[in-house]
Structures are given as C-alpha cells and as structure tokens.
C-alpha cells in the first residue's frame, strides 16, 4: 500500500517539506531538488511541485497530470521525444496542473497534514491524483517544472497490473473510487486542459468533435 507506506513515513519526518520519491528513479540534473523547492518556497509558491520524468528510451513519461484523459487521468505529453517544447510550450514551461505523479512529488508538510496525507483506500493507483485534487480543493496550487529531471523505470517497483487478475480488480476499484470521491464530471473537466483537445490520448491533439467541425462532418445548430 503506497499510501500507507508514505503516511507511516510522515510520522518520522520533521522537515518543512516532504518528498515522495519512488525507488526506481535516477537523477538527471544535479539541482533537481533545489528546483522543486524553489517552486514551493517563494511567497505565493505552490504547495506541491512535480518533476519531469523520462523513460529509459528518452521519451517523456510525465510532464504533469491531466484528469479525465482515458476517462480517469493521464500524463501530459507521454511518449513524446525528449528535447521538444510540446504543445504551446507546455513541455518546457513551469505551470500549474490539477495533479502531478507521486513518483517524484514535493509537498509542504503543513499542507500534507491539513488534508490528512494520502488516502489508504487508494493502495496503489490514483493516490497521487486524489491527494493533489484535495490539495487543490483546499485552495492551494500544484506546479510542475521541466527543470527537475529524472529517469523513471515505471512500475519496476511493483510490476504491472494488466496480467494479474487481483491487481486488475484492485485497479478497477480504485478507478471507481476516484469518481466516487471527486465526482465523474469533475474528473472529466480539468480546468488546466482545453476541452477542444482529445481525451483519448496524451498528445494534445484535437478532439474528434473539433476535427469534425473543421472538416465539415459536424454542424452546429444555433438556436434563437
């Protein structure tokens, strides 16, 4: 239980900030932790800051989380080649998101305590999304920075969920809990994501509806 492990660790932490960090990541730039702290420590700074994570093949694994992608949540610019600026420079700009991954997440200890830490009912999946949404709903900012970079050997810590029926059932239950806690409509309408873009992929391409309007396959009926 990832949530339980981190909640347990909080009992023994005494700093002003907590860093959630998976044991399957490797640091890419020396000042990564300074950069995360920079985004949180200045006046008006974020309560949470996440990092830019890469796969070992030099494609992006995480550049912020968009809720609603794939029906629940997905990673911005996932699988994009490293080095580009992304959609509207969003892969190269410090910005706010609704959530960031818990694989590398810095949070103010006071905010962690205020919202009660991680929800242990989300044992593995979506605990980071749920946590960030509760922090956002409490009035705080969640930031992501491309200037803290790490390589993430995703799921090496625990393995995949797809082929194990027990893990698959747990994952499905956590998906439904995300809707139950935060509301399906809320999950599907991320305020940091253009509703004209696709919810099926993580590449910021146009939605089928917008493409249909541009190609004339879909028409809009105006009412007086």
Question: Model-predicted segments: where are they?
Answer:
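Short, high-confidence coil segments that cap the C-terminus of an alpha-helix
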Residues: 15, 44-46, 140
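Active-site acidic Asp-centered loop
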Residues: 21-23, 119
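C-terminal, non-catalytic tails of nucleotide-sugar-dependent glycosyltransferases
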Residues: 57-58, 69-96, 106, 142, ...
């Amino acid at each position: 239980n990832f949530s339980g492990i981190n909640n347990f660790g909080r009992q023994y932490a005494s700093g002003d900030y907590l860093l959630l960090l998976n044991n399957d990541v490797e640091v890419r730039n020396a000042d990564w932790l300074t950069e995360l702290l920079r985004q949180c420590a200045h006046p008006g700074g974020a309560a949470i800051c996440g990092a830019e994570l890469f796969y070992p093949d030099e494609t992006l694994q995480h550049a912020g989380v968009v809720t609603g992608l794939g029906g629940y949540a997905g990673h911005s610019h996932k699988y994009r080649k490293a080095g580009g600026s992304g959609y509207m420079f969003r892969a190269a700009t410090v910005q706010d998101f609704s959530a960031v991954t818990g694989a590398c997440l810095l949070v103010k200890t006071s905010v962690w305590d205020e919202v009660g830490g991680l929800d242990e009912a989300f044992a593995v999946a979506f605990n980071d999304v749920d946590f960030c949404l509760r922090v956002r709903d409490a009035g705080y900012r969640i930031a992501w920075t491309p200037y803290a970079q790490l390589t993430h050997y995703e799921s090496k810590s625990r393995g995949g969920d797809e082929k194990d029926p027990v893990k698959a059932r747990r994952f499905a239950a956590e998906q439904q809990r995300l809707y139950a806690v935060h509301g399906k409509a809320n999950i599907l309408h991320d305020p940091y994501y253009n509703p004209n873009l696709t919810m099926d992929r993580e590449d910021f391409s146009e939605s089928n509806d917008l493409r249909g309007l541009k190609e004339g396959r879909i028409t809009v009926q105006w009412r007086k």
